[in-house]
């Protein structure tokens, strides 16, 4: 009774300080008090659940008010787990929250004794560090802020995706967009990164008063309106695109796939609207120059497999190995977690200067000029071997699209029959059986 009465007095004290102007300075003190309560009470105590609710209530206030970290979902999942260690992965923009998240997980769980955060930068959901976690003895990985690109069934440890949602204000968008899109019958697409996608349906209904034709595109298996730096959608008969997010990396994938489209970016953090531009002709001319240089090295090449999480696709590796054998191209295979000039120079030696990288397709598009060697993507390797055609009108961004071609992670046997016909080299029964052993 003595502990409970002191708890009630302190609870009233917290209520009395809520309306104070400087009440924010009391939050760490309240959490320190509740930390002592957690240590003094047993997990089976009746008051534990009450203090836990109060702890969560005041812990939420230490986070930004517009961030949703799915703490209740985390709590439910932790109640079903029996491991005493957790491995966390957070994007670079959310790394400042990792201490708070580790503390709250240790408080709400009955078994967790240690929580470790990966020091490697998590660029996307393709960087799932399940192998690294297993090597250090962790059986559970909490991955924050990305969509489910890598199936949890393919991971060697239990991976739990935590979808971090960011709420934002879009009340002034109709009046601002009315100046940019003058006609009511303009066809407009709305897209965003996964953190902001939860508000897309509300934005669509909100903008329906100003525009008649609004669409939220979807590239399966991604969520409606979701955009990746390596996966976007083909746009036809549209007046423009509204992209919600910060930075240019993700939205540039739309420019690669649709060079002539009008794109307006709304940054929720700065609340600014920007009309974006992109020099697509320069990117195409660079690609053509690299492919022309690579024609001198078609007798041999090197495949470099991205080992940063799950970036590299073993299916794509098997397909380009088959294509190399079919075209009588000698190859060597290497793996690396980081692709840079130093690693390529060390690996090169007397080898060919042509490298086909199987990590992120944007490396060959954005940073090809920074490499001393020729670094091509599987799509560009297909152009080099005449397995696909490139007309210069667009660069496909469909790496995680289910309807993608042989250079994508969902490629199938049907894609191989299509690509080999382009070079008047139809697969025979012998080659078909040979390829089935690869795939």
What are these regions (language model features)?
Residues 2-33, 40, 44-47, 51, ...:
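Peripheral docking tails and interdomain loops at the edges
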Residues 3, 58, 65, 76-77, ...:
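Phospho-regulatory, Ser/Thr- and acidic-rich intrinsically disordered linkers and terminal tails
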Residues 126-128, 170-175, 225-228, 273-280, ...:
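Short, charged, surface-exposed secondary-structure boundary motifs
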Residues 283-286, 290-292, 315-376, 381, ...:
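A C-terminal functional module that forms or caps the active site or interfaces directly
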Residues 134-146, 184, 189-190, 234-244, ...:
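A polyampholytic, Gly/Pro-enriched intrinsically disordered region
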Residues 203, 250-331, 338-346:
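Redox- and metal-dependent alpha/beta enzyme cores, enriched for Fe-S-associated oxidoreductases
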Residues 146-148, 246-248, 308-309, 360-363, ...:
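Short glycine-rich anion-binding loops that position phosphate/pyrophosphate groups of nucleotides
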């Amino acid at each position: 009774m003595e502990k409970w009465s002191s708890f009630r007095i302190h609870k009233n004290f917290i209520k009395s300080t809520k309306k104070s102007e400087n009440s924010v300075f009391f939050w760490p003190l309240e959490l320190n008090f509740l930390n002592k309560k957690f240590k003094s009470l047993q997990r089976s105590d009746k008051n534990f659940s009450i203090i836990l609710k109060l702890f969560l209530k005041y812990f939420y206030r230490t986070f930004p008010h517009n961030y949703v970290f799915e703490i209740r979902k985390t709590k439910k999942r932790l109640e079903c787990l029996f491991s005493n260690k957790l491995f966390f992965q957070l994007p670079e923009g959310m790394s400042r929250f990792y201490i708070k998240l580790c503390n709250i997980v240790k408080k709400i769980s009955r078994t967790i004794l240690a929580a470790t955060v990966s020091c490697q930068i998590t660029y996307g959901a393709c960087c799932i560090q399940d192998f690294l976690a297993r090597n250090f003895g962790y059986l559970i990985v909490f991955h924050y802020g990305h969509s489910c690109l890598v199936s949890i069934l393919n991971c060697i440890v239990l991976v739990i995706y935590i979808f971090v949602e960011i709420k934002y204000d879009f009340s002034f968008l109709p009046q601002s967009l009315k100046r940019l899109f003058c006609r009511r019958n303009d066809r407009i697409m709305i897209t965003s990164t996964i953190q902001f996608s939860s508000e897309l349906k509300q934005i669509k209904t909100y903008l329906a008063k100003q525009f008649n034709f609004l669409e939220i595109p979807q590239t399966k298996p991604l969520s409606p309106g979701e955009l990746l730096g390596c996966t976007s959608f083909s746009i036809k008969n549209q007046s423009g695109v509204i992209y919600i997010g910060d930075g240019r990396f993700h939205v540039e994938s739309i420019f690669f796939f649709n060079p002539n489209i009008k794109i307006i970016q709304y940054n929720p953090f700065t609340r600014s609207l920007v009309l974006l531009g992109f020099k697509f002709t320069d990117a195409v001319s660079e690609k053509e120059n690299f492919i022309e240089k690579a024609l001198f090295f078609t007798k041999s090449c090197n495949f470099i497999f991205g080992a940063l999480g799950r970036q590299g696709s073993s299916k794509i590796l098997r397909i380009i190995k088959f294509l190399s054998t079919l075209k009588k191209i000698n190859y060597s295979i290497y793996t690396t977690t980081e692709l840079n000039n130093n690693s390529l120079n060390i690996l090169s030696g007397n080898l060919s200067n042509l490298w086909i990288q199987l990590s992120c397709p944007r490396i060959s598009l954005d940073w090809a000029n920074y490499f001393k060697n020729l670094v091509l993507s599987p799509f560009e390797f297909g152009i080099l071997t005449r397995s696909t055609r490139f007309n210069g009108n667009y660069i496909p961004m469909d790496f995680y699209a289910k309807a993608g071609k042989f250079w994508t992670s969902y490629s199938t046997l049907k894609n191989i029959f299509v690509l080999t016909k382009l070079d008047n080299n139809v697969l025979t029964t012998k080659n078909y059986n040979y390829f089935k052993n690869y795939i």
